[in-house]
């Protein structure tokens, strides 16, 4: 009976993530578009203190009421961070949004900032206090360990990154549709070649829509057959030639490669 109760609780917990109360509107729009307010309620803004002013630096995903998933390259041990949750516009103090200080930074032990192409661009941030879940603040689902998405699987990248190479940064959360590019294609010489590893996901490369500066650390959202959105990627890097360069897809940390690490960090901290 206890085992059955525990199992039902775990199943209920799994179903409580990745299902926004405000469903995203998903037409394909060249260059991305404003997201529907609070339709990606696990998306957070990671901000750092700059002489008393909080500045957006990266995105992230709320994966537990006390933990945010982001990219390792977003983190500097010398900075003080906070996480802003439940926000649509970064310039407006919206009702129901929260700003919570970060109490602990856990960067993957194999991350090397001088060797970005080795991967392991993943970090977890512990919040100073757990957050309550609402329609505006929800958990992102993680995929099953080892999951590999097929070529051309439809996903959406979200964030407050630049609208184009060297362009302006938006106040409003943006979304853009990206198609997954499988490893066999993305690792071809005319694409990313040996820069891309199997612990990464490529998506995009059409020369139109991509992630850009300021999106780093944010989620690649992919919908499962049951309607739940899962966070399959963490924005890691793009081409130095520009954000929307043809045959240079956005590259993401493949979350399904790090499920054991994520669970271990949360359980032991």
UniProtKB/Swiss-Prot annotation:
<dbReference type="Pfam" id="PF00089">
    <property type="entry name" value="Trypsin"/>
</dbReference>
<comment type="function">
    <text>Elastase that enhances insulin signaling and might have a physiologic role in cellular glucose metabolism. Circulates in plasma and reduces platelet hyperactivation, triggers both insulin secretion and degradation, and increases insulin sensitivity.</text>
</comment>
<feature type="active site" description="Charge relay system">
    <location>
        <position position="216"/>
    </location>
</feature>
<dbReference type="GO" id="GO:0006508">
    <property type="term" value="P:proteolysis"/>
</dbReference>
<feature type="active site" description="Charge relay system">
    <location>
        <position position="121"/>
    </location>
</feature>
<keyword id="KW-1015">Disulfide bond</keyword>
<dbReference type="InterPro" id="IPR043504">
    <property type="entry name" value="Peptidase_S1_PA_chymotrypsin"/>
</dbReference>
<dbReference type="InterPro" id="IPR050850">
    <property type="entry name" value="Peptidase_S1_Elastase_sf"/>
</dbReference>
<dbReference type="GO" id="GO:0004252">
    <property type="term" value="F:serine-type endopeptidase activity"/>
</dbReference>
<keyword id="KW-0645">Protease</keyword>
<comment type="subunit">
    <text>Interacts with CPA1. Interacts with SERPINA1.</text>
</comment>
<dbReference type="InterPro" id="IPR001254">
    <property type="entry name" value="Trypsin_dom"/>
</dbReference>
<dbReference type="GO" id="GO:0032868">
    <property type="term" value="P:response to insulin"/>
</dbReference>
<dbReference type="GO" id="GO:0090330">
    <property type="term" value="P:regulation of platelet aggregation"/>
</dbReference>
<keyword id="KW-0378">Hydrolase</keyword>
<protein>
    <recommendedName>
        <fullName>Chymotrypsin-like elastase family member 2A</fullName>
        <ecNumber>3.4.21.71</ecNumber>
    </recommendedName>
</protein>
<dbReference type="GO" id="GO:0004175">
    <property type="term" value="F:endopeptidase activity"/>
</dbReference>
<dbReference type="InterPro" id="IPR018114">
    <property type="entry name" value="TRYPSIN_HIS"/>
</dbReference>
<keyword id="KW-0865">Zymogen</keyword>
<feature type="signal peptide">
    <location>
        <begin position="1"/>
        <end position="16"/>
    </location>
</feature>
<dbReference type="GO" id="GO:0050796">
    <property type="term" value="P:regulation of insulin secretion"/>
</dbReference>
<feature type="active site" description="Charge relay system">
    <location>
        <position position="73"/>
    </location>
</feature>
<keyword id="KW-0732">Signal</keyword>
<feature type="disulfide bond">
    <location>
        <begin position="155"/>
        <end position="222"/>
    </location>
</feature>
<dbReference type="InterPro" id="IPR001314">
    <property type="entry name" value="Peptidase_S1A"/>
</dbReference>
<dbReference type="GO" id="GO:0005615">
    <property type="term" value="C:extracellular space"/>
</dbReference>
<keyword id="KW-0964">Secreted</keyword>
<dbReference type="InterPro" id="IPR033116">
    <property type="entry name" value="TRYPSIN_SER"/>
</dbReference>
<feature type="disulfide bond">
    <location>
        <begin position="212"/>
        <end position="243"/>
    </location>
</feature>
<feature type="domain" description="Peptidase S1">
    <location>
        <begin position="29"/>
        <end position="267"/>
    </location>
</feature>
<feature type="propeptide" description="Activation peptide">
    <location>
        <begin position="17"/>
        <end position="28"/>
    </location>
</feature>
<comment type="similarity">
    <text>Belongs to the peptidase S1 family. Elastase subfamily.</text>
</comment>
<dbReference type="GO" id="GO:1901143">
    <property type="term" value="P:insulin catabolic process"/>
</dbReference>
<feature type="disulfide bond">
    <location>
        <begin position="58"/>
        <end position="74"/>
    </location>
</feature>
<keyword id="KW-0720">Serine protease</keyword>
<dbReference type="InterPro" id="IPR009003">
    <property type="entry name" value="Peptidase_S1_PA"/>
</dbReference>
<feature type="disulfide bond">
    <location>
        <begin position="186"/>
        <end position="202"/>
    </location>
</feature>
<dbReference type="GO" id="GO:0005576">
    <property type="term" value="C:extracellular region"/>
</dbReference>
């Amino acid at each position: 009976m206890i085992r059955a109760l525990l199992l039902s609780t775990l199943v209920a917990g799994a179903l409580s993530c990745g299902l926004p109360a405000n469903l995203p509107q998903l037409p394909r729009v060249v260059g991305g578009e404003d997201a529907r307010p609070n339709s990606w309620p696990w998306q957070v803004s990671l901000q750092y203190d700059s002489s008393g002013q909080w500045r957006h630096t990266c995105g992230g995903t709320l994966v537990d009421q006390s933990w945010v998933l982001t990219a390792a390259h977003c983190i500097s041990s010398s900075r003080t961070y906070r996480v802003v949750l439940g926000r649509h516009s970064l310039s407006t103090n919206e009702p129901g949004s929260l700003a919570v200080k970060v109490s602990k930074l856990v960067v993957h032990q194999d991350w090397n900032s001088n060797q970005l192409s080795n991967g392991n661009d993943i970090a977890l941030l512990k919040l100073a206090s757990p957050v309550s879940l609402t329609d505006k603040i929800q958990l992102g689902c993680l995929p099953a360990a080892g999951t590999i998405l097929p070529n051309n699987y439809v996903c959406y990248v979200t964030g407050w990154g630049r609208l184009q190479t060297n362009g302006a940064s938006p106040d409003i959360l943006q979304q853009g549709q990206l198609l997954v590019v499988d490893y066999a294609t993305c690792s071809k010489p005319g694409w990313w070649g040996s820069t891309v590893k199997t612990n990464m996901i490529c998506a995009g490369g059409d020369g139109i829509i991509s992630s850009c500066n300021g999106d780093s650390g944010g989620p690649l959202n992919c919908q499962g057959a049951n309607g739940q959105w899962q966070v399959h990627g963490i924005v890691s890097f793009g081409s130095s030639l520009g954000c929307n360069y043809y045959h240079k897809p956005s590259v993401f940390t493949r979350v399904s490669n790090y499920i054991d690490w994520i669970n271990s960090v949360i359980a032991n901290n």
